[in-house]
Amino acid sequence: MQYGVVEITSIENGKTAKVNILNGIKEGEPSHKWKLGSWNRGSGYPKLCTFYQDRFVVAATNKKPNYIWMSRTGDYPNFGVEKVEGTITDDSAITLPVINRKMCEIRHLIPANDLIILTSGNEWIVSGDKTITPTNCNLKTQTQRGALSCEPQFIGNRCVFVQE
């Protein structure tokens, strides 16, 4: 199977689209297996970004306000979960839905010893004890209060924010 990236320039009907090939596939080879990227005009683009453990981290689109995407390690524009010989590598990109009992909009990403994620209804961390990989990236909820949209601040080594 061949993978690639294209830009849709027009849609002819429910089964056919014209595209500009950006990379990875040959012209004139039709495919019935395709998927829209996470970010586009219809779904929106990330509202938040930061860097954490040599990954570019973005979050909160209009359609997925509770999602986080982490780039491949050291390859900041690459959010592809590329596989080598059928396995996910430690430097592969990561996509995380941040959800507990209810879906809450992510409002802040704060890089510290841990990656702090503040939402409209709760607070989370991605532990920085070990290097983050697709197989050990675990979200841990902290409280069920949530944060307002005003910018969190560090006072000493403490992150201070206004709760919902």
Report residues per predicted region:
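Residues that cap or initiate secondary-structure elements
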Residues: E12, N23-I25
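SH3/SH3-like beta-barrel fold
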Residues: A17-I21
